[in-house]
């Protein structure tokens, strides 16, 4: 795990990036921007003590959205390797459940990422 500081306007990651880390927001506010969003307003907000960037890590897929700092932010990053170690130490049922929930969430968001309503 590593503590990282970002300035307002910086991206933690962009849509299409590899998903080597997931993040815990310690301080600030993160905006999640879907690829079709050309506005300055995020599709979703991440607040303090919330995790983000988990879907790509859980599913071993590319980032489906970008995470931009709406304010100066401090995050803690957890590498995919560290995440998998923690997950492998837990109940196998939990591992399957997390993966299933992530896939279902991505499917629910898919129309939004393709520009459909």
Predicted regions and their residues:
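Cyclic nucleotide-binding regulatory module and flanking cytosolic helices
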Residues: 1-8, 57, 88-90, 114
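Solvent-exposed strand-loop boundary residues in beta-sheet-rich modules
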Residues: 36-38
């Amino acid at each position: 795990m590593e503590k990282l500081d970002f300035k307002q306007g910086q991206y933690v990651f962009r849509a299409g990036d590899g998903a080597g880390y997931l993040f815990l927001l310690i301080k600030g506010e993160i905006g999640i921007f879907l690829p079709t969003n050309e506005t300055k307003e995020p599709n979703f907000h991440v607040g303090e003590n919330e995790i983000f960037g988990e879907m790509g890590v859980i599913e071993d897929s590319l980032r489906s959205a970008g995470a931009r700092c709406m304010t100066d932010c401090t995050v803690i990053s957890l590498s995919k390797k560290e995440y998998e170690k923690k997950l492998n130490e837990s109940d196998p049922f939990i591992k399957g459940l997390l993966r299933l929930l992530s896939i279902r969430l991505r499917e629910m968001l898919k129309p939004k990422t393709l520009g459909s309503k």
